[in-house]
Amino acid sequence: MTQAAANPAQATPPTPRPGFRIEKDPLGYLEVPDGAYYGVQTARGIHNFPISGTRPHPALVKAIVCVKKAAARANMATGRLPKQLGNAIVEAADEILWSPPARDDELGSDGHSDPMRAGFQAARLAKQAELIDNFRIDPFQAGAGTSHNMNANEVLANRAIELLHVSGVGSGKRGDYAVVSPNDHVNMAQSTNDVFPTSMRIATLDLIRDFIPAAEELIHAFEQKSREFDDVLKSGRTHMQDAVPIRLGQEFAAYALTIRRGVERLQTAGQSIAEQNIGATAVGTGLNAEPEYIELVVRNLAEQTGHHLRGAENLVQATHSMRPMLEVSAALRGIAVDLVKISEDLRLMSSGPMTGFGEITLPAVQPGSSIMPGKVNPVMAECLSMVCFRVIGNDTTIAWAASAGQLELNVMMPVIAHTALESLTILTNMSRAFAEFCVTGIEANREHARDLMERSSALSTPLAPYLGYALAADISKQAVRENRTIREIVIERGIFSAEDLDQLLAPHELTEPGVAGGFRFTPRLPEGYKPPTGPVGAGG
């Protein structure tokens, strides 16, 4: 592509090179590839923003096409857009939004594949892929997403031109905007400033809808393991030091609930982005958008997306404030922070296998070292942490971008959309992968965990209500000093029998609210020692 021809005063278009056509915008003439469904303004955007080498998120592409379809339907209903043109725009949009039917729907009445139907599906898939491939604007682009909006306008206009030609209308040549105009027809009653934020919010809602079942898979995996590990007694740890016992199942149940609470907060945040500013046009005043159109386009979007969308209470506020996206990102950050904590816990509990905690074994999914034979690393947990670090970083980007708007518009929306959609995508994929390749295959090293717990000096804590803090502390110090267990020393001193200790230190006695043993046991205390009259608290 050459930008040299951009001359608005030039009276006649230059001759294009082979394989190109000439289009004109307010900056002048420009070559556009013959086979492109995009047009001159997209071509300028491609030329101006070769930043990341990536393209718009697929969810954002489908969302903006969905907005264009809803707008065309609304404009036809108000009588402003001729139905012949509007229907062509809607048909072009449907080619991009089309979803392949379920596999069973491709079978004929005899239960075998229908070649004609299969060929039709293949042709639709090919056309859909071709059209989506024409969305080329880098996520780091012109402020507010103008290039992305025009990319959608041009692709739909050029495809509508072809569809109308099949019906005998127009030349059918891409770039013949006298037939269907990207601005006057596809963008009718719209501005980038209401199209892009609406598209961004719908795409985010779509990906939240995808994330929820993935998160549920992860929650379910932890819940299953919590039941499986409910009888596995292990040492708790605070400050990275031995603490009172806990059941491994309790830890896994807490992980499941932690994730569920995060998902609930995300769903609450998602309600705020159900409010759409479509109809706001440029600055939120709704200039050039009829009230009837605004009501219809929101209704159409709700119908097309399946989301419970609503029009903004105040279009000016909804246009300049990015608070709803900030709330979604903050909820994602919260989930990510919790998942890092869980990941680090699992890595610690699985550390070793011979010189670490070794209380659990994570599934071996690939060799861990190119130099140390037989080494296996907690790669899924490591990957989870890295994904979450990215989400946390994306939230920082969104916070800065949300704060950077001026007056009636926040022009940083493209980076907000890009990072929010990336966060949802990688968290969704990671949740499924972590559930499948890690959590479901975790094994508890029961005997080893029990042995470590038995050697913990913190086992003096359930004895404190019977013995008092001072005597329990003395026993704990002796255990550490002599590298022996609390059980051994208590039995040696004759304070409790082995049988009493078996009941007193049973898993559920140690890991449920209340005093272990419920004061059912009487210790043999040193002569002259006065036992406590009730439970004695011991801080951690």
Q: Where do the language-model regions lie?
A:
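Conserved, well-structured ligand/cofactor-binding cores
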Residues: 2-540
